[in-house]
Amino acid sequence: MINEIKKDAQDRMEKSLEALKGHISKIRTGRAQPSLLDAIQVDYYGAATPLRQLANVVAEDARTLAVTVFDRSLIQAVEKAILTSDLGLNPSSAGTTIRVPLPPLTEERRRDLTKLVKAEGEQGKVAVRNVRRDANEKIKALLKDKEISENEQRKAEDDIQKLTDSFVKKVDEVLADKEKELMDF
């Protein structure tokens, strides 16, 4: 029973960490990353379709993304979707390829993005701590129902705390990597 609670807590903490990584990967650094365009939706015959389903996105160099559209008739729609996104990008098309140059980030914008990364990280830590709280409540319920002893409860709560500490440390590592990436020119 306790092992199931620990396993569930670990799985939920891993999901929280993955969600944090997903949120942080969308924050633009000065470097070209294909994942930057993941959130863009293109109007494809009246339906909003993810760009990834309509085109291949690769980093051409450190400051340019190349978007190769599978269907020539969609080039204008893809270009418009990139232009109207809130990423501040200005695409230009050449044949079936759309080049998206990334403007360099200003120092002030880097600081703003760093604050955003820290806020996302704090939300990630809160999510991990909420998982810990839920697991501890389940363990206390087992003690109350006399399914486990107090010693087993203490041991289980210590294990959950160690798990929480390790995931908070992983969140800090992800944040440090992203902040370093943001501040590198």
Swiss-Prot record:
Listed name of the protein: Ribosome-recycling factor
Similarity annotation: Belongs to the RRF family.
GO MF, one annotated term: ribosomal large subunit binding
HAMAP family, per database record: RRF
Record's keyword annotation contains Secreted: no
Described function: Responsible for the release of ribosomes from messenger RNA at the termination of protein biosynthesis. May increase the efficiency of translation by recycling ribosomes from one round of translation to another.
Gene3D superfamilies the record matches: 3.30.1360.40, Ribosome-recycling factor (1.10.132.20)
Primary site of residence: cytoplasm
Organism: Actinobacillus succinogenes (strain ATCC 55618 / DSM 22257 / CCUG 43843 / 130Z)
Signal peptide: none
Listed GO CC annotations: cytosol
PANTHER family referenced in this protein's UniProt entry, alphabetically: MITOCHONDRIAL RIBOSOME RECYCLING FACTOR PSEUDO 1, RIBOSOME RECYCLING FACTOR
Compartment list: Cytoplasm
Keyword Protein biosynthesis: yes
